[in-house]
């Protein structure tokens, strides 16, 4: 296909869906004369997850544009980065990566014979490369080396020398792989600019750098191999995919920090050029979107329900994962997977003294700062028909701004001056441009006629009074819940409305000093 494209068409394919390009003019000049040589490298650390489909889809674009593409399995980098891959499993993890990356490429129809695969240690241990590492270390400052790796190399209080070497080796890879361009995530930008600064100091040319956006995880933060709850593994079973998507942050009408929408935008749309929302005929039937922004708008306007969005992603994702699961269902690859990533629970613990602060944090209700609030004012969100912007007195000097998706469920007059229950220690986040400083907790019942009701504090409660689960009233709430730790999400899984309309956690009542928290009519409902 590349032979039949003009330089402009090749440029469009190479740069589509990228967040940033450094050296675009040089890229244009090369495309006028010959095919681009580009490489993508991946350190063989944690198990690859579904966000790896983002670079895979770009590799498909590069091949369509006629590029000569190299995939580097950066095994030495995996060890240098605070030994994320211990030396004794380094070779096994590299083999795992090679097999799983090839399976991913095959699942999206990329011909493997057009790619060059190489391991870092195939050339990084040579005399010439080692000498260049020493040459580079003589001109690079400690400050620049640490700054370059800040977004990629694990940050610790006392950095190891190996982590400071990491950016320099990645820069040298561009020369030793004989490429025109390096492709990676925007989190690599500081390493890319480091390479642009220091390669010329060794007499080597500055390369082009192509950067794709980072995909938020299911919790709204960056999707990470080291955060189990934030990502879907390529070998996760269908039931695990369903479970993780069910827990994913996907608030009605909220397109900010929405990991499910982000996955559609950055993974599913580039691969298929369309996305189908699967839903019952009574809700309008299936709908096909050929432009992501149309889907985002419908979600923001609550035309598309989070449940339908998650179910549709589940179906599309499993179609991508099925060929990979099938390939890894052989005895040889099962054995490789177990050896490369041994189950920590089956490993014998090392005999050491007690570690400081080694006990895991308890996920208990007292960590939530839940208070009685009084709604001072209610207005429609200026940019979202489905959202209210409320000012709520929670016993502080100033009322808090809280954004909630209640327009379709609760009339404005019913909220005005009402006592409500507010979760106050979530990390503030923007919802369609307005920063929300809390969550108004509600009961809800899903189904044909979805119903939502704010929780009611007991009569006589006052703004600022603490809401607690009986038996956990003495614990101290976290100052701010860290999104990565998912404390609220883990506790919320056991929130329920009892048959007596009482809000409960694990069948234990939510209370204030005046009595139990309740809702008007939604027995058996969920709480969010």
Curated annotation (Swiss-Prot):
It is found in: Cytoplasm; Nucleus. It catalyses: tRNA(Tyr) + L-tyrosine + ATP = L-tyrosyl-tRNA(Tyr) + AMP + diphosphate + H(+). The modification N6-acetyllysine is found at residues 197, 206, 474, 482, 490. A motif ('HIGH' region) lies at residues 44-52. The modification N-acetylglycine is found at residue 2. The modification N-acetylmethionine is found at residue 1. The modification Phosphoserine is found at residues 205, 386. The keyword Secreted does not apply. The keyword Ligase applies. Residues 338-362 are annotated as: Disordered. Trans-resveratrol binds at residues 39, 170, 173. Keywords: Acetylation, Aminoacyl-tRNA synthetase, ATP-binding, Cytoplasm, Ligase, Nucleotide-binding, Nucleus, Phosphoprotein, Protein biosynthesis, RNA-binding, tRNA-binding. GO terms for biological process: tyrosyl-tRNA aminoacylation. Residues 364-468 form the tRNA-binding domain. Pfam families: tRNA-synt_1b, tRNA_bind. Tyrosine--tRNA ligase that catalyzes the attachment of tyrosine to tRNA(Tyr) in a two-step reaction: tyrosine is first activated by ATP to form Tyr-AMP and then transferred to the acceptor end of tRNA(Tyr). Also acts as a positive regulator of poly-ADP-ribosylation in the nucleus, independently of its tyrosine--tRNA ligase activity. Activity is switched upon resveratrol-binding: resveratrol strongly inhibits the tyrosine--tRNA ligase activity and promotes relocalization to the nucleus, where YARS1 specifically stimulates the poly-ADP-ribosyltransferase activity of PARP1. PANTHER family: TRNA-AMINOACYLATION COFACTOR ARC1 FAMILY MEMBER, TYROSINE--TRNA LIGASE, CYTOPLASMIC. The nuclear localization signal, which mediates localization to the nucleus, is also important for interacting with tRNA(Tyr), suggesting that it is sterically blocked when tRNA(Tyr) is bound. Homodimer. Interacts (when binding to resveratrol) with PARP1; interaction stimulates the poly-ADP-ribosyltransferase activity of PARP1. This is Tyrosine--tRNA ligase, cytoplasmic. It comes from Bos taurus (Bovine).
């Amino acid at each position: 296909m590349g032979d039949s494209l003009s330089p402009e068409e090749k440029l469009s394919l190479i740069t589509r869906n990228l967040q940033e390009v450094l050296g675009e003019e040089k890229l244009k000049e090369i495309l006028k004369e010959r095919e681009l040589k580009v490489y993508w490298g991946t350190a063989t650390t944690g198990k690859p997850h579904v966000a790896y489909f983002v670079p895979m889809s770009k590799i498909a674009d590069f091949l369509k544009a006629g590029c000569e593409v190299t995939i580097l399995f950066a095994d030495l980098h995996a060890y240098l980065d605070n030994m994320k891959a211990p030396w004794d499993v380094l070779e096994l993890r590299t083999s795992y990566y090679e097999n799983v990356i090839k399976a991913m490429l095959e699942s999206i129809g990329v011909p493997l014979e057009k790619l060059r695969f190489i391991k870092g240690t195939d050339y990084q241990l040579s005399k010439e490369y080692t000498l260049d590492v020493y040459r580079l270390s003589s001109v690079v400052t400690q400050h620049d080396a640490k700054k370059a790796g800040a977004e990629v190399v694990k940050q610790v209080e006392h950095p190891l020398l190996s982590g400071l070497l990491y950016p320099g080796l990645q820069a040298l890879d561009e020369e030793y792989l004989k490429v025109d361009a390096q492709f990676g995530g925007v989190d690599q930008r500081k390493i890319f600019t480091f390479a642009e600064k220091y390669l010329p100091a060794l007499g080597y040319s500055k390369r082009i750098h192509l950067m794709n956006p980072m995909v938020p995880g299911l919790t709204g933060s960056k999707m990470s191999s080291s955060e189990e709850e934030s990502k879907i593994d390529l070998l996760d079973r269908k039931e695990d995919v369903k479970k993780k998507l069910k827990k994913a942050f996907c608030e009605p009408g909220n397109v900010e920090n929405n990991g499910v929408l982000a996955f559609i935008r950055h993974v599913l749309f580039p691969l298929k050029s369309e996305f189908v929302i699967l839903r019952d005929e009574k809700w309008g039937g299936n709908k096909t979107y050929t432009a992501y922004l149309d889907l985002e708008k419908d979600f923001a306007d609550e035309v598309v329900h989070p449940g339908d969005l998650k179910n549709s992603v589940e179906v599309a994702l499993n179609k991508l994962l099925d060929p990979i699961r099938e390939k890894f269902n052989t005895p040889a690859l099962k054995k490789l997977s177990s050896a490369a990533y041994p189950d920590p629970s089956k490993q014998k613990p090392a005999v050491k003294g007690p570690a400081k602060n080694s006990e895991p944090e308890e996920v208990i209700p007292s960590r939530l700062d839940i208070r009685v609030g009084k709604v001072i004012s209610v207005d429609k969100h200026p940019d979202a028909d489905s959202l209210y912007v409320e000012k709520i007195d929670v016993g502080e000097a100033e009322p808090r701004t809280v954004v909630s998706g209640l327009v379709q469920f609760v009339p404005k007059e019913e909220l005005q001056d009402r006592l409500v229950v507010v979760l106050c220690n979530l990390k503030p986040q923007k919802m369609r441009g307005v920063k929300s400083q809390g969550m108004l907790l509600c009961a809800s019942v899903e189904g044909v006629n979805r119903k939502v009701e704010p929780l009611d504090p007991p009569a006589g409660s006052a703004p600022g009074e603490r809401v607690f689960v009986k038996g956990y009233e003495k614990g101290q709430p976290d100052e701010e819940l860290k999104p990565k730790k998912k404390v609220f999400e883990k506790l919320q899984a056991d929130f329920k409305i009892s048959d007596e309309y009482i809000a409960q956690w694990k069948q234990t009542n939510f209370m204030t000093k005046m009595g139990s928290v309740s809702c008007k009519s939604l027995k058996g409902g969920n709480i969010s």
